[in-house]
Amino acid sequence: PGSVLEGIEQSLRRTRSEKIDVFYLHSCPADILQRGDLQDTLDRAVAAGKIGVAGYSGDNAPLAFAVDSGRFGAIETSVNIADQWNLRNVLGRRSEIGVIAKRPIANAPWRFAERPAGNYAELYWERLQALELDPFGMEWAELALRFTVHAPGVHTAITGTAKLDHLRRNIAAANCGPLPATVLERIDRAWRAVGADWPAST
């Protein structure tokens, strides 16, 4: 609890702010969350006006516990075409929680013709190969972004880039709207066939 409070105070000092809109606990294990003392600290910070909303960033069982606890108003979690555990098993349990999807383009594994051993995209590359999907006439980035941004329960997504042109293309792709139902059905069939037991990447 002390480190959480210090993190809040440091953030306030660094941003020269009186209040942090959303403060996230990152990747906190379920057994720690179950004690409840970290949430108590966040509740006190909300009551004191130091933060607006207490959030949790994580995946799998700890995320499910955080959502079910009812003590967080926002979550940040992995959601993409190759990482659907959180989407299928957690999102939508509590409609009042704000959801930020991280890794919305799955670390762009389509950049690699062969397995990118040791690269952060390696797991998602393996999963895309197993899913045997094609981009349905779109660029992979468009398919991935539209899948994530318009997924049920997702309110926004974080995608990083160092190039302004890539940012503009990402915005344009998201603005194309949800994927066609036929495309979503094929993705769903592929996931159910080989990916149903895949946990979220942490």
Residue ranges, per PLM feature:
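Structural motif corresponding to the early beta-alpha repeats
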Residues: 1-2, 26
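Short, well-ordered amphipathic alpha-helical segments that serve as non-catalytic structural scaffolds
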Residues: 2-12
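Active-site groove signature of glycoside hydrolases
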Residues: 12-32
